[in-house]
Amino acid sequence: MVELTLSEQTWLKEYYPELSYDSSNHKLYGKVSFSLRYEDLPVNKGSYDFDVDFSLMKGRSDFPCVYNTDHRIIDAAKRKRKPLADFHIDSDGKLCMILPCKMPQFYTNGFNIQEFMTHLCNHLYWVSHYDLYDKEPWPGEKHGNEALIEYVKDYRNINLIVNDKKQLELFRVLFNKKYGKGIALNKLKNRLLTDESLFKELINWK
């Protein structure tokens, strides 16, 4: 699990006084209030109740489980008769905020509470705007497997992909199936970094 530092706890008390940190259970809970504006769109104000569970995080390269405990987001999806995925939330109230493989891209120095709260409030602004106006304020992330496929197919993410052993292993499986022979992970990593055509061949191979 991950424990919030004293400086993180102090920061939370100053900027998000409606949240409480339970150090024994490694949870943050309470109300998150925001007032935000994006470009020339209207200001959105709102508040949602949350539990943020840090207990399953193995380190700061992981992301906490974030649950909307007043069910406002699920209720909005039901009211609009839209899939929960459109509101980036699962049936148990857990928010879909980030693909695990994108953590190094958005949290370059690892998880910290200040960046997380900005991330969460931006997420809530998006959800609130979508609920109010039936339009995305900016293009939303894909959900679930669709998001993973979109991420992996984008060569701009190659440095993150090849430095993630699980993702690199998937490319080795594709390489073995396509060419009928094995390849060392380090060799495959170097080839993928220098040969975009190989990357595209493996991504598009069936």
Protein language model regions, located:
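Extreme N-terminal tail/first-helix region
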Residues: M1-L12
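Preference for intrinsically disordered or flexible, low-complexity segments
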Residues: L4, D40, Y133-E136
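Compact alpha/beta protein-protein interaction domains typified by the UBC
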Residues: L6, Y16-K102, G110-E115
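Domain-scale recognition of soluble eukaryotic interaction modules
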Residues: D70-K206
